[in-house]
């Protein structure tokens, strides 16, 4: 294990986090708020160890897959702990476990909150709370790859593999560092475009910024107690469209950028993703049409909610907890499916779900025709058995973590639907669940123990399980 490289990168993470805290400090100063001191102290606390750890580059720059996984997992934990300090020092949240839960929920773009009301919070805290979504959406290690002038064996690719969502990582161009820059360029472009369209709809600048951060990162922290219900249909429509856009694999946008529209439109995962969204909207609208004054309003709010859930954003315009059983069941299924691989969305990912179903049909076919040789195809290519194995192992680990989490938080004696959807909402990085953790509720009712379990789930879901699990695997720390 190359500990010197791991600590060196964590040092850079702390320095970057200090820089990313500056906009929140500026917002606090603009609004003359007392939380400015909390941000200043946190910046100093990040810089002291950060500067010490990066003073000297490691001599040994060999960086294998396990170093990549450990670095990513530890970086997210350290980043979350330091990011929780402004909540505590400002008095916005007094319980350290609650502060950690809220911060992890922000960075992992989950949007689950322990706060019963957010409108009393200071602007600086609200800004930081939403900004964590934007930081975590594309990944802070991916951002670091754009900046850090470090060369080493396997360094760039192993970091990117460990942090990027989906069953596999694709380099858009030969150099991984250039790929990271392209991804962030596309991310920034879509962010600015949505911001402009929100301003056109006369949304205040501060509200627009916080909304854009939540949409881009598919997070869901709002600055209103009713999430997004108080805004106009135009603004809700803009957010609906951009939630869907941020849930698409960024490789598709890169193909459009490279003037290869035919290749982009052939993306199978994106077609499945859009098809699932369209079908879900039509079916749910049929069942909830009597809940609204017109069919248009029913379609409008259902489209918003479907986009919010499948992309794991978590914004809400209505309390879907009050809808009939079938619409709620569809929304729960969408929680598990999630967005596309290579997007900022969470969940199992559309590509994995498609591969799982095709693996199932292949096995059924081979049971009928044992001598048949049949390959699984996806995106126009035969899928390598290594990818299929990784998908199957991922699902096994996912089910195990899910089941254990539901069992452990059962200690609080809440109903099964609450516990089940609380784990679904955190492990899939969505935010709201059903019943006591519905869109009009919060996670503050859970004990500290359960909050820590759900915090683990949020980190595990964002990091695709394995980087976090490897921290607890004895073989990770062995010297070979």
PLM regions and their residue ranges:
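Membrane-proximal intracellular helices of multi-pass ion channels
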Residues: 1-480
């Amino acid at each position: 294990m190359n500990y010197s490289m791991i600590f060196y990168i964590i040092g850079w993470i702390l320095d970057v986090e200090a820089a990313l805290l500056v906009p929140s400090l500026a917002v606090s100063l603009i609004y003359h708020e007392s939380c400015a001191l909390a941000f200043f102290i946190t910046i100093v606390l990040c810089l002291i160890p950060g500067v010490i750890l990066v003073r000297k580059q490691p001599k040994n720059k060999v960086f294998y897959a396990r170093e990549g996984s450990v670095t990513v997992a530890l970086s997210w934990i350290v980043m979350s702990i330091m990011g929780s300090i402004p909540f505590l020092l400002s008095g916005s949240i007094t319980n350290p476990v609650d502060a950690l839960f809220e911060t992890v929920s922000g960075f992992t773009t989950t949007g689950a909150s322990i706060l019963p009301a957010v409108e009393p919070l200071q602007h600086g805290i609200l800004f930081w709370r939403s900004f964590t979504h934007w930081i975590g959406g594309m990944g802070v290690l991916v951002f670091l790859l754009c900046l850090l002038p470090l060369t080493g064996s396997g360094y760039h690719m192993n970091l990117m593999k460990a942090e990027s969502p989906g069953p596999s990582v694709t380099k858009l161009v030969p150099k991984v560092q250039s790929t990271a820059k392209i991804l962030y360029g596309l991310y920034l472009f879509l962010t600015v475009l949505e911001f402009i369209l929100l301003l056109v709809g006369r949304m205040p600048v501060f509200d627009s910024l916080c909304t854009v951060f939540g949409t881009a990162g598919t997070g869901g922290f709002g600055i209103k107690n009713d999430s997004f219900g108080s805004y106009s249909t135009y603004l809700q429509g803009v957010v609906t469209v951009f939630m869907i856009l941020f849930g698409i694999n960024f490789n598709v946008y890169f193909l459009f950028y490279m003037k290869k529209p035919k290749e982009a439109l052939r993306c199978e995962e994106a077609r499945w993703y859009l098809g699932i969204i369209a079908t879900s909207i039509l079916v749910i609208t049929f069942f909830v049409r009597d809940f609204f004054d017109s069919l248009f309003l029913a379609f409008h709010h259902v489209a918003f909610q479907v986009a919010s859930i499948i992309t794991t954003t978590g914004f809400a315009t209505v309390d879907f907890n009050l809808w009939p059983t079938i619409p709620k069941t569809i929304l729960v299924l969408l929680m598990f499916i999630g967005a596309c691989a290579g997007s900022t969305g969470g969940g199992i990912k559309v590509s994995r779900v498609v591969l799982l179903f095709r693996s199932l049909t292949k096995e059924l076919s081979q049971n009928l025709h044992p001598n048949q040789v049949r390959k699984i195809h996806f995106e126009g290519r035969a899928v390598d058995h290594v990818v299929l194995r990784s998908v199957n192992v991922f699902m096994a680990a996912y089910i195990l973590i899910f089941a254990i989490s539901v069992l452990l938080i059962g200690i609080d004696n809440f109903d099964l639907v609450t516990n089940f959807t609380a784990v679904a909402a955190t492990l899939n990085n969505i935010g709201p669940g059903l019943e006591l953790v519905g869109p009009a509720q919060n996670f503050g009712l859970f004990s500290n123990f359960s909050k820590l379990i759900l915090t683990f789930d949020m980190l595990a879901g964002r990091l695709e399980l394995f980087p976090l699990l490897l921290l607890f695997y004895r073989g990770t720390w062995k010297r070979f």
